[in-house]
């Protein structure tokens, strides 16, 4: 990827979720080296198939520290909203602190200059809730709403 022009690199990030996720990892963990592995490629391919509508249900079951959260709760919502600013994405977590961190990390990706160069998607300026953010096209990444009477 060293001989690519910036336009070519951007096109790859737009079209290949695996490379996009790797860029997200590097942005969020500048002190760590990304270690490519087959399981990351498989998850990235399955998530890309979800976005394309080829897979309707997907469970990712791996031990901790295998990039599940980065791939499925940070990079994937950002990539989907980049391609479809009206997409409606629910992100669920077992803990509030983790849910807040994942939402902040996803938002931080979406406001970076390189993301804004890749996609036309913009976050609505009037929404500043930690976990929920809305695009200017009414798409969102949000926790599920509790059901009530």
Placement of each model-derived feature along the sequence:
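Walker A/P-loop
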Residues: 54-77
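Contiguous, well-ordered alpha-helical segments that form the cores/surfaces of helical PPI scaffolds
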Residues: 44-48, 70-82
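Post-Walker A helix-loop "phosphate-sensing" segment adjacent to the P-loop in P-loop NTPases
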Residues: 79-88, 111-115
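N-terminal accessory segments
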Residues: 1-55
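Residue-level preference for the first positions of well-ordered beta-strands
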Residues: 57-59, 88-90, 140
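Alpha-helix boundary/capping segments in eukaryotic regulatory proteins
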Residues: 66-72, 82-88, 93
């Amino acid at each position: 990827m060293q001989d690519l022009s910036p336009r070519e690199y951007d096109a790859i990030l737009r079209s290949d979720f695996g490379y996009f996720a790797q860029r997200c990892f590097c942005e969020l963990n500048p002190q760590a080296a990304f270690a490519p592995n087959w399981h990351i490629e498989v998850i990235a391919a399955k998530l890309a198939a979800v976005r394309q509508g080829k897979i309707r249900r997907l469970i990712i079951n791996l031990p901790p520290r295998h990039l599940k959260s980065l791939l499925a709760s940070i990079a994937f919502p950002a990539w989907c909203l980049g391609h479809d600013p009206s997409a409606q994405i629910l992100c669920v977590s077992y803990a509030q602190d983790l849910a807040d961190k994942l939402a902040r990390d996803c938002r931080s990706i979406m406001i970076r200059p390189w993301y804004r160069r890749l996609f036309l998607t913009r976050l609505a300026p009037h929404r500043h809730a930690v976990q929920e953010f809305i695009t200017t096209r009414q798409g969102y990444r949000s926790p599920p709403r509790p059901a009530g009477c």
